[in-house]
């Protein structure tokens, strides 16, 4: 958003996945790193205001204590607390609650970014599918319930989100519409294959019809001080 020329760097329509998957593969090759998957932090080991590690729950439910001289506390997201979120539903801010329990200061927990365009789902237990803003950079348009444009699609995320919420309230609807038919079909299928496929699975043929969109919680910038 907030751009007047095409300047978004992306990999198809899965930029985030492309970056994180490459980083993850690089970390797995490091000889001094052990990765515990499907593992939850239950508590930290703390004495006299010093952290000595963490208590974790493995996938099979067993509890273990991991001792450490240094502990980096990466709290993760809070998307599971929202009706619509691009985050996984199990991200509910547990680490922030633990921080408060141990009297650890938090910072910027009011810094929550709402992405203006995700595919609208009535099932609130499902993770919201992000419709990349790069499609708007390529010419996609937004419409109200009467199929009238109501906003400049290239506004910054916060302003566009506000405009969409205002239109939804005005129309008494749960979503607005996005029209990707302004983008040539070959370009759609080449540049945004995952969006096209996901919408197809949801019963919408992107090259032929509009899709329902709703803003959703996306990034959480706060955490431990």
Q: Where are the model-predicted features located?
A:
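Short, solvent-exposed loop/turn segments at the edges of secondary structure
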Residues: 3, 75, 93, 135-138
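Thiamine diphosphate
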Residues: 87-100, 106
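Flavin (primarily FAD) binding-site architecture
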Residues: 73-87
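An anion/pyrophosphate-binding glycine-rich loop and adjacent beta-alpha core
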Residues: 98, 104-219
């Amino acid at each position: 958003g907030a751009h007047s020329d095409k300047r978004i760097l992306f990999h198809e329509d899965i930029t985030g996945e492309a970056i994180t998957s490459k980083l993850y593969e690089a970390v797995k090759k490091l000889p001094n790193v052990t990765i515990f998957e499907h593992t939850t932090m239950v508590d930290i080991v703390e004495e006299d205001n010093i952290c000595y590690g963490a208590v974790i729950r493995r996938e099979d439910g067993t509890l273990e204590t991991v001792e450490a001289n240094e502990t980096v506390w990466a709290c993760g997201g809070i998307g599971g607390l929202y009706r619509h979120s691009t985050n996984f539903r199990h991200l509910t801010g547990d680490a922030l609650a633990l921080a408060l329990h141990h009297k650890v200061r938090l910072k910027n927990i009011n810094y929550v970014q709402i992405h203006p365009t995700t595919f609208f789902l009535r099932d609130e237990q499902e993770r919201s599918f992000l419709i990349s803003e790069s499609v708007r950079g390529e010419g996609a348009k937004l419409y109200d319930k009467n199929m009238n444009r109501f906003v400049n699609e290239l506004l910054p995320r916060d302003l566009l989100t506000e405009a969409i919420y205002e239109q939804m309230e005005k129309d008494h609807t749960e979503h607005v519409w996005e029209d990707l038919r302004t983008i040539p079909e070959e370009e759609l299928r080449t540049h945004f294959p995952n969006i096209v496929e996901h919408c197809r699975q949801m019963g919408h043929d992107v090259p032929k019809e509009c899709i329902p969109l709703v803003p959703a919680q996306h990034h959480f910038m706060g955490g431990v001080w």
